[in-house]
């Protein structure tokens, strides 16, 4: 909230065994918090949470979703070699069946292969979310300098493309090539945690938004991608719009002309002339100052 974000969604840190503790921890904050539950029962206690299929406990997963139905907004499956080891797409097959039984959206993380992005798409459906789309790894959205036809087909099938910046998952060059090809992200997200919040390259949502301004996206389009589109992707019916009947969650910010260095996950740096400075938020109807307005000493 202090960085101008009124609602956050944790993308799979916890699984069925520890999501209850996470839920209780969120109650101490004014920020609205929701979660995608990891299909691995232990969540991300290590980077290879799906190296054993025994880590998927369908009964406990469904029980946790039912118990925390107003908190869990979808399920998360991390599909990269370091996570699944030798299991390839087998965890994703299970995740697809479970998410259909629960009628929840599914977010899929992809990185190094196997599984390949082509194989991953075989188990994704309309309304599912692919994150880290600009990750810069060989198993990415480009084939040479062209966007893979599978990505174009996925968009046509209604699969949601999410940025998921993260420490290692955002290449500005790939993002620009994708934009030039007419393939745009549906949602812009940070994949933020303590390391990339303090040391970069993420820092906060505003900085991620500034990168898309630098790449030529309009501020209005960017705002849609971090508000309305994001809320729609996980069916948060009362979020994402300034409209009667919606929650009174707002961010007040200044857009100022000043030079600032921006860095992607591959150490590419650019200088932008546009900076977003959150000044205040309204969370559940409560107004809170978080910064100084234009004209005041910074």
What are these regions (language model features)?
Residues 4, 22, 75, 130, ...:
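Divalent metal-coordination and catalytic microenvironments
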Residues 77-177, 182-199:
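Active-site core of metal-dependent hydrolases
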Residues 173-255:
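His/Asp/Glu-enriched, well-ordered alpha-helical/loop segment
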Residues 6-7, 74, 129, 187, ...:
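Residues at the N-termini of beta-strands
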Residues 247-297:
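C-terminal cap of metal-dependent C-N hydrolases
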Residues 21-22, 45-51, 87-89, 117-121, ...:
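Short acidic, glycine/serine/threonine-rich loops at helix termini
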Residues 1-80:
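Divalent-metal coordination cores built from histidine and acidic residues
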């Amino acid at each position: 909230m202090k960085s101008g974000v009124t609602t956050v969604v944790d993308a799979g840190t916890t699984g069925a065994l520890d999501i209850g503790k996470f839920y209780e921890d969120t109650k101490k904050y004014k920020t609205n918090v929701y979660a995608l539950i990891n299909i691995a029962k232990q969540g991300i206690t290590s980077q290879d949470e799906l190296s054993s299929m025994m880590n998927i406990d369908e009964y406990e997963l469904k029980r946790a979703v039912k118990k925390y139905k107003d908190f869990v907004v979808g399920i998360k499956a991390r599909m990269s070699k370091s996570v699944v080891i030798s299991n390839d797409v087998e965890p994703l097959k299970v995740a697809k069946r479970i998410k259909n039984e629960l009628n929840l959206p599914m977010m899929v993380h992809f990185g190094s292969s196997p599984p390949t992005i082509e194989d991953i798409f075989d188990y994704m459906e309309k309304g599912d979310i692919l994150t880290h789309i600009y990750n810069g790894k060989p198993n990415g959205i480009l084939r040479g300098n062209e966007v893979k036809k599978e990505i174009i087909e996925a968009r046509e099938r209604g699969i949601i493309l999410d940025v998921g910046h993260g420490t290692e998952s955002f290449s500005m060059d790939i993002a620009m090539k994708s934009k030039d090809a007419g393939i745009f992200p549906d949602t812009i997200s940070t994949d933020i945690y303590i390391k990339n919040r303090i040391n970069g390259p993420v820092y906060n949502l505003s900085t991620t938004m500034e990168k898309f301004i630098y790449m030529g996206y309009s501020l209005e389009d960017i705002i849609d991608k971090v508000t309305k589109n994001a809320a729609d992707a996980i069916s948060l019916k009362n979020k994402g719009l300034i409209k009667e009947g919606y929650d009174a969650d707002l961010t007040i910010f200044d857009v100022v002309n000043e030079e600032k260095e921006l860095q992607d996950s591959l150490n590419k740096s650019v200088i932008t002339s546009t900076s977003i400075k959150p000044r205040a938020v309204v969370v559940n109807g409560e107004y809170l100052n978080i910064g100084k307005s234009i004209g005041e000493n910074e």
